Amino acid sequence: MFQIELDEEPVAPKVLEFFKNLPENATAEQSLETFQKTFSFLHENVLEKYTSDLFTPSTLKEELDEQLAQAENNAQSQLSELLKNTKRFVLNYDNDRPEDLEAPEYFTQLVDGVLDKKEDLEANISKYLTKTWSFSRLTLVEQAILQVSSYEILYTETPDVVAVNEAVELSKDFSDEKSSRFINGVLTNFLK
């Protein structure tokens, strides 16, 4: 067996010397100065690398802000791609093969409008749900139908009755009879 003694290594005593020479409550500048004096024997390139690695100020907030900005950019590009694919799917719903169709202006206005006003629409719809039901508890189909119809009622010139009837018909096609009655009730109260 053999034993490694750190005292034989040239760096270990220098680390101890650094900590001994470091003033109590030293500022970053004092720490850097002490480090450079203690490790002056190192080659200039090595000293520069250790100095920049150890004494470059970096805050957690800056690192998190950078990562958050990158994540938001990624999410935005993924959302744009998802929206594009969703529009293509909806436009080709009845087609045997997907075609490159142009979205009607009103369809684009509805989709973009619902996305822009999502929080307001959810808050308005939630006012007309019972205390035991939250908006997030609704099925995704019910959420989408209620958002589109409430957007039509609040922000377009579509007659309110037409918006409600379209919502009820959509819920019959994509959900069940119980859901269509529920949507009719929520939207009827929404109009009052």
From Swiss-Prot:
InterPro entries in the cross-refs: NusB-like_sf, NusB_fam, NusB_RsmB_TIM44
Q: Is Transcription regulation there in the keyword field? A: yes
The GO terms this record gives for MF are: RNA binding
Q: Which of UniProt's keywords are assigned here?
A: RNA-binding, Transcription, Transcription antitermination, Transcription regulation
Q: Which GO terms describe its cellular component?
A: cytosol
Q: Which spans of this chain does the record mark as coiled coil?
A: none
Q: Give GO terms for biological process.
A: DNA-templated transcription termination; transcription antitermination
Q: Does the keyword Secreted apply?
A: no
**NCBIfam families, from UniProt?**
nusB
Q: Which family does it belong to?
A: Belongs to the NusB family.
Its function, per the record, reads: Involved in transcription antitermination. Required for transcription of ribosomal RNA (rRNA) genes. Binds specifically to the boxA antiterminator sequence of the ribosomal RNA (rrn) operons.
Instruction: Please give the PANTHER family that the UniProt record associates with this protein.
Output: ANTITERMINATION NUSB DOMAIN-CONTAINING PROTEIN (PTHR11078:SF3), N UTILIZATION SUBSTANCE PROTEIN B-RELATED (PTHR11078)
Return the protein name. Answer: Transcription antitermination protein NusB
This chain's source organism reads Lactococcus lactis subsp. lactis (strain IL1403)
